[in-house]
Amino acid sequence: MWMQLNTRLMIALCFIAGVNAFSQKKIKQLDKVEVDILYNYYEQDGNNGAVTGGLGTEKLDNNAPQISVSIPVNKTATFGATLGLDHYTSASTANIDKYGAVTSASTRSETPENNDNNLASEDTRKYLSLNFSRLMPDNNSAVSVLYGYSKEFDVTSNYGKITWQKDSKDGNKFLSITAGVFIDKWLLIYPGEIRDGRNTGAGGGKNGHHHDDDDDDDDDDDDDDHDYYYDYFNTDKDKDDDKDDDDDDHDHDHHDRLVTTNYSARDDDDDDDDDDDDDYYGNQTAAAFKGYDKDTRFTYNVGATYGGNINSRLNASVTAEVIIQKGILNTPFHRVYFNDGITQEQFKHVKSEKLPKSRVKKALGFRANYFVSNFLVTRLFYRWYTDDFGIKASSFEIETPIKLGDGFTLYPFYRFHTQTKSDYFEAYGAHNLDAEYYTSDYDLAKFTTNKYGVGMKFSPVNGVLGFKINKKREFQFKSLEFRLSRFKRSTGLEATSITLKNTFTF
């Protein structure tokens, strides 16, 4: 379901932030323990739900608390950990069994409106990441490694990343190279009528699942927007608060949702779904999931960023990234209805979304910060994206932090995104019956998006408040931030994101 979250919500990108390389933050050494506590609320609504074939509710609500801790080990090394939850309710995914299910977790009515199935309408995604970084002052370089894990009822993910950074002798320029891998394990949960073997016109696989090896692909956009850490505040403009564009397909604020140290991701995974599902849904629902097949998605990304200070007022960076995905790139419970001449939905030809089992994404980004005056900064960002699904996209963002007083900054922002549709996308009921690949997921459609909002940060030089813990240590409440954003897509999807963050050291 993270995919649903990421793609609809996550308005993330994100946000892959895999594509997060665009928002890379330079490795630095801390001299105190630093703790970030963040809470994000996200809601969206629209009428192009992929679960119901591209026509139907996209309503979703998400609550996401997160805590990150960075601990200096010595003068050159830092250890960090991030722990978070994403609890969401989704009217869209509640329709997985819209026309009948054979799971023991629910009893179906002949009338869809009378069904009370919570198979996927509510879930909690849990995630954890650990990172270690080390500075090497003798050669002006640094290295960091990160491991992440996340799980929700149908997906379990493991993620690893390594970053190498080299600074010039004067510290004015830097080169950063990052490589990462995601391994996502999916439960193949198909729509109820397909599990029953009805209306597919294609036979079924095991247990009535429409599962020939090609069926498990995935428009995996979600994946990308699943970067381990979504940067909500984007106040450090080395970062990109919306991973969404990387996968341009997901330009929602998913990306305003999750935060973690560097990467936000669609980490939802696990083979032992059976056991964990007990915790989520109780023995009855866990038993319902035990019969499902599983499939795996592998995502590899490599990125490089070069940047530095051009003069006393301007600094800039350029980032290039390549992402390669293999395995299940479709979402099994996404329906696709075909152009078969039948008007009554219950009798239309329906299949599970089918996409190629590999995908290559390429992106190039440019970022610049111009210090107009002592109280005004202009931050500009542009990204170009293309993939072999036929999508081409461009994103532009501007943010203007304004210092209003001692430690108080107001930063309005605006982001525009446009993309072409995937070769495999058609709207509800528009696919030809002989199509090899097909999806009605509007994250892969042609659209434009507008995202706008405002952030406020209070960060006095000496902190908001502080007190002595002992002779050597002092607790300091360093900063408090608030961020509000609105997102609108030309297809009708709208979203709101509210984020609160505070930072303290000791």
What does each model-found stretch correspond to?
Residues N74-T76, P137-N139, K169-G171, N309-R313, ...:
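Outer-membrane beta-barrel channels and translocator barrels
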Residues N48-V51, G56, G84-L128, G171-D217, ...:
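Outer-membrane beta-barrel translocator/channel fold
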Residues I67-I71, L130-R134, I162-K166, V302-G308, ...:
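Residues on the lipid-exposed face of transmembrane beta-strands in outer-membrane beta-barrel proteins
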Residues Y41-A64:
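Surface-exposed strand-loop-strand hairpins of Gram-negative outer-membrane beta-barrel proteins
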Residues Y39-D45, L85-T89, Y147-F153, K166-S168, ...:
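Transmembrane beta-strands of outer-membrane beta-barrel pores
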Residues K59-P65, E122-L128, T156-G160, T296-V302, ...:
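Residues that define the transmembrane beta-barrel architecture of outer-membrane proteins
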Residues V35-I37, A81, V143-V145, L175-A179, ...:
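Membrane-embedded beta-strand positions of outer-membrane beta-barrel proteins
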Residues A105-D116, I323, L329-S358, A363-R367, ...:
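Outer membrane beta-barrel transmembrane domains
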